[in-house]
Regions:
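A surface-exposed beta-strand-loop module
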Residues: 106-167
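Zinc-dependent metallopeptidase catalytic helix centered on the HExxH motif
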Residues: 194, 320-383
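Second-shell loop/turn segments in exported
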Residues: 131-135, 188, 270-279, 322-323, ...
Length: 483
């Protein structure tokens, strides 16, 4: 999925176009198998309030809640090759005020029992909300455990794409790809990127299967024809970036040194019929070090890739370990790794700011291409600017001002987002531009951001008034004039 492929249509394609062919040469020992086992509107608020069912996201206002912050998710999930799961998710959270009830996002699945602070709680379902009424009003820090089972559904996005729980291997496997809201198909959660948390996932499968995950691999425990894979994410992670992928994989383990000398384990999971994918695996250390020199230190403790024909037609930057639908090309690899800085460590507050993810990752492709015999970023910018007339769909809607969630993965976030960054570079100069990129990654590491924050940083570093510049490039649905 090269940059050109992704920008053929207005509906940009890192997420919407099948991964392209690649090249394949590094490999270190196989691991082996894992095991598996199958696993309404609130009452009228009083002084002790019912938690809002919604977090104020402009594109997905029905998702998430703003009345509490989740600190950690502990997920125990058993999977059977029938496609059924049996699971328990325990979350630790902090209520922002006393709550008589609160809600989590959950699509499909059958809830068996809910406990809050160790006591059985009442619950009900409304649309994709699990509404929980504790036996006692929740104050401050609290825990909630939800036991559930069933066959997870696949969520259909507003643009028609699939996300969430994706059955593979004829239903005998599965891969989780949750951007933007698919996380609710496999565990109950506060499904908004503004509420990041740490994760501890224990996934039990039949011993003939392996489990890839986001985070760091802590253990693989064998027991009675099953294996339990434990993946721990010690850093803040948005719910859509939590990933598991269950299949018959070849597992490759190696290590690398970052530019700061840190030793980084690399765990990659490759579908056997796709070969060893050696070239793209070998490229991981090179890409990470390349991006470190431009964006700052790699923000996580491990790396790797998952290469699997999922049939969804897109790759996703799941934290630590991107997932590719088939063997990726170099630029797709570069794109997904750039997201570890911009999107995963530095995360959105509101989905309307998706350009802060996709524009940055697309610009990383331009940088890589320019450093490896391709056109300069200025040449790429000019080519794209000249080849898209004022009537082209690229220019509408604006990257940071649209209201249709079906436009979330349109080219305004990818291509026009990258063009905005190059235009900024030409406006403030390369020196200040790269200070802005590195400061953005450092200042907001593991946090959440908005477009106005990026504008303020750019003005502070450059000493320029950039209001008119950013208004033209990000907020007006028309082709910006070049100064």
């Amino acid at each position: 999925m090269s940059a050109d492929q992704r920008l053929v249509a207005t509906s940009a394609p890192r997420r919407r176009v099948p991964a392209a062919l690649a090249i394949g040469a590094l490999g270190l020992g196989l691991l082996a198998t894992p095991s598996g086992l199958a696993i309404a509107k609130p009452a009228t608020p009083t002084q002790a309030t019912a938690a809002s069912r919604q977090a104020p996201d402009s594109l997905f206002p029905e998702q998430g809640s703003s009345k509490y912050d989740v600190k950690d998710y502990a997920i125990k999930l058993g999977f059977e090759t029938s496609g059924d799961i049996k699971a328990k998710t325990t979350l630790t959270a902090k209520a922002k005020k006393s709550l008589t009830s609160f809600s989590l996002d959950l699509e499909g699945l059958i809830v068996d029992k809910v406990r809050v602070n160790g006591r059985t709680a009442d619950f009900s379902r409304r649309d994709n909300k699990l509404i929980i009424k504790p036996a006692k009003t929740v104050k401050g820090r609290f825990s909630a455990s939800i036991a559930y089972h069933g066959k997870p559904v696949t969520h259909i996005d507003p643009d028609g794409a699939q996300d969430g729980w994706i059955p593979t291997d004829g239903g005998a496997g599965a891969t989780v790809l949750s951007e933007p809201v698919g996380a609710m198909t496999w565990f109950p959660n506060n499904n908004t990127p503004r509420d990041k948390a740490t994760f501890d996932m224990k996934i039990t499968v039949p011993s003939k299967l392996e489990v890839a995950g986001s985070g760091d691999l802590k253990s693989v425990r064998k027991h009675a024809g099953k294996e339990t894979w434990r993946w721990v994410q010690p850093y803040q992670q948005a719910t859509y970036l939590a990933m598991i992928s269950i299949s018959d994989y070849n597992v490759y383990h190696s290590t690398m040194r970052t530019t700061t000398g840190r030793k980084l384990p690399i765990w990659s999971f490759i579908e056997p019929k796709l070969g060893t994918v050696a070239d793209e695996r070998a490229l991981i250390p090179t890409i990470i070090r390349y991006e470190e020199r431009r964006f700052g230190p790699y923000p996580f403790n491990s790396a790797g890739i998952v290469v699997k024909e999922t049939g969804v037609g897109y790759a996703l930057e799941t934290q630590n370990r991107p997932v590719f639908d088939g063997v990726p090309d170099d630029l797709t690899n570069v794109h997904e790794w750039a997201h570890q800085w911009y999107g995963n460590s530095v995360s959105l507050t509101n989905w309307v700011d998706i350009w802060l993810n996709e524009g940055f990752a697309t610009y990383a492709e331009w940088l890589w291409d320019a450093s490896h015999g391709g056109p300069s970023t200025a040449e790429t910018f000019q080519k794209e600017y000249d080849s898209h007339p004022a009537t082209d769909p690229l220019w509408t809607p604006a990257p940071a001002d649209f209201d249709d969630p079906a436009d979330l993965f349109g080219s305004q976030g990818y291509l026009r987002g990258a063009m905005t960054l190059q235009a900024l570079r030409q406006q403030v100069g390369s020196h200040d531009f790269f200070i802005i990129l590195r400061t953005w990654a450092k200042q907001h590491k593991y946090g959440n951001v908005t477009t106005p924050q990026f504008i303020r940083l750019s003005e502070r570093v450059s000493g320029q008034d950039l209001d008119a510049f950013f208004k033209a490039w990000l907020y007006i649905p028309k082709k910006p004039a070049l100064s």
